[in-house]
């Protein structure tokens, strides 16, 4: 299960993106061909987020949380320049947040048959999202955001993750609205 970050003193340099989850090797040529940010540092310690906040403007700005696509096995919070939130934050007068979390076997391998301590193993990638949403709720006001006005949005696999968060009572206090863009199918063929 994810571990919440320990507080630190002073200012934390956040000028570079944090590591992304380990990626499926066969997808790397596709992403590289498209010029996407897929050659970033990969790590199991990839639970990080990016925040864009405009200068000035209204207090208690709406918060828009982006959950990337890529199924539950690939992608990252800044894989395309169009997913960086600077322009939307600036022109929409919102706080834009994107989340990295564990994917593939690091986030969804089911080990519960090996004992009680592994009962939550198939859901640690989703648990990463819940912990990120909790952090946003507790800290977004420091960036000018309103923790009572949070919309989560995801496309493709990210849409499926938004659907998962809608079903979790642990996630419910941390957002008020959700947008699913081509989310997960629910039939057995998926």
Question: What do the predicted segments below correspond to?
Answer:
Residues 159-171:
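Short glycine-enriched nucleophile-adjacent loop
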Residues 62, 121-124, 136, 142-156:
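Alpha/beta-hydrolase fold nucleophile elbow
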Residues 92, 172-185:
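A conserved short beta-strand
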